[in-house]
From Swiss-Prot:
The keyword Iron-sulfur belongs to this UniProt entry's keyword annotation: no
Protein name: Nickel/cobalt efflux system RcnA
Induction of the gene: By nickel and cobalt. Transcriptionally repressed by RcnR.
Domain of life: Bacteria
Family as reported in the entry's similarity comment: Belongs to the NiCoT transporter (TC 2.A.52) family. RcnA subfamily.
Gene transcribed to yield this protein: rcnA
Length: 274
């Protein structure tokens, strides 16, 4: 496969770099551990913008380290498949796994949204019934905030963070440690980067893809952390489409991953048919 320098000279490398950056940015927007944990942590400790940037960069560094290990491991393993006859089959297998990952991400997001909506409907009914009883018995209402959609695991992490750190002073080392540990959680997008690196069989281009993915992830995580520090609620109030964009990000991410899988599958199939 052509090295990155040759691809750059031919003008063909532009497709890989923006796609990897977009994958990283969309992964950071998905409802999950990194974004939810960081926002909850910054809000709980009443963190500054500087602390939010530190937290986002620390999470990105650890996440990048995991992706580098996976990607380089994949490229080392791929050296065993140097025969041209094996490459189309490897492309086809990678395409199947990538498309399967995209479908899994789409289904997981759809199921999480559906469960969240069902729980909110049940909560609305119980809350309305409870308020009706309080109006007759006590003459007052209990008010609860309706939270934004997030998966159950992420919500549990956020609640635990609030209990542990609410109102406490934390050091910069604690912030860095929290960010480093929070970024170690693997993600489907990292698997996609791994499979792309295996398919490309190019060390330089594979490393560039990982760096590009990390840049996109860093942009999102740092932005989320800073947004939490300056109160993301204000942004949501001024722009009604903010929450909708965040909730729809996993769908865009799964679509992009699926397109990459289709692209690889078509090339693999054409290679087998030759």
């Amino acid at each position: 496969m052509t090295e990155f320098t040759t691809l750059l000279q031919q003008g063909n490398a532009w497709f890989f770099i923006p796609s990897a950056i977009l994958l990283g940015a969309l992964h950071g927007l998905e409802p999950g551990h990194s974004k939810t944990m960081m926002a909850a942590f910054i809000i709980a400790i009443k963190g500054t913008i500087k602390q939010a940037v530190m937290l986002g960069l620390a999470a990105t560094i650890s996440h990048t380290a995991v992706v580098w290990l996976i990607a380089f491991g994949g490229m080392v393993i791929s050296k065993r498949f140097t025969a041209q006859s094996a490459e189309p089959w490897l492309q086809l297998i990678s395409a199947v796994i990538i498309i399967g990952t995209a479908f899994w991400m789409f289904w997981r997001t759809w199921r999480g949204e559906r469960n969240w909506l069902e729980n909110m409907h049940e909560y609305d009914y119980e809350h309305h019934h409870h308020d009706h009883e309080d109006h007759h018995d006590h003459g007052h209402h209990h008010h609860h905030e309706h939270g934004e959609y997030q998966d159950a695991h992420a919500r549990a992490h956020a609640n635990d963070i609030k209990r542990r750190f609410d109102g406490r002073e934390v050091t910069n080392w604690q912030i860095l440690l929290f960010g480093l540990t929070g970024g170690l959680i693997p993600c489907p997008a990292a698997i996609t980067v791994l499979l792309i690196c295996i398919q490309l069989k190019a060390l330089t281009l594979g490393a560039t893809l990982v760096v590009s993915f990390s840049i996109g992830l860093a942009l999102t995580l740092v932005t989320v952390g800073v947004g939490a520090a300056i109160s993301v609620q204000q942004v949501a109030k001024r722009w009604s489409g903010f929450n909708t964009l965040a909730k729809r990000a996993p769908y865009f991410s799964s679509l992009l991953i699926g397109l990459v899988g289709v692209y690889m599958g078509v090339h693999g199939f054409m290679g087998i048919m030759r």
